[in-house]
Design a protein with these regions (language model features):
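Bacterial N-terminal signal peptides
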Residues: 7-16
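Extracellular/periplasmic metallocenter environments
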Residues: 27-36, 41-42, 91-139
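Sec/Tat signal peptide C-region and signal peptidase I cleavage site
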Residues: 19-26
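Beta-strand cores of secreted/periplasmic/IMS beta-sandwich domains, seen most often
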Residues: 54-73, 77, 97-103
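Positively charged n-region of N-terminal signal peptides that target proteins for export
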Residues: 1-4
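N-terminal edge beta-strand
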Residues: 26-64
């Protein structure tokens, strides 16, 4: 009887203690690439509020960054510096979401370059198309 109660107590304790991913759920930061008239496109909030062509974020290790393409153009992503990221296919298309996971501490620089120009897409813009650069400081 004592063994049964001890076994039941251990099982209850083991089930009640979160481990692995549940114990350390990674925060998710959401951003967008949005179309604007000046410079064609910029980084934006998850609600598509423009932030500018360059942006710096400070996040903790394990953070996931999701970037939604709310611009009608395709973009190529490239890592300029920092610990290696799993980029996969560098090209992303309108309406898709790109996810990066920052598993190691360091300073990462990611560049997003539009594949089609604003002229090719028949869009009227002011000035040259921006090349977007995102700096992510991971502590």
């Amino acid at each position: 009887m004592k063994r049964l109660l001890l076994g039941l107590a251990l099982c209850t304790t083991a089930v009640g203690v979160p481990t692995g991913a549940a114990a350390a759920a990674s925060p998710t930061v959401r951003m967008a690439i949005v179309h604007v008239v000046q410079g064609c496109h910029v980084w934006g909030t998850d609600l598509s509020q423009p932030l500018g062509p360059t942006r710096t974020l400070a996040v903790k290790r394990g953070t996931r960054l999701q970037i939604r393409l709310n611009c009608p153009m395709s973009f190529d992503f490239a890592q300029l510096s920092g610990p290696p990221l799993a980029l996969g296919d560098p090209r992303s298309y309108p309406g898709t979401v790109r996810t990066f996971v920052f598993a190691r501490k360091g300073v990462y620089r990611i560049q997003a370059t539009n594949v089609e120009s604003s002229e090719q897409m028949g869009m009227t813009t002011i000035g040259a198309d921006n090349v977007l650069v995102l700096t992510v400081r991971v502590s």
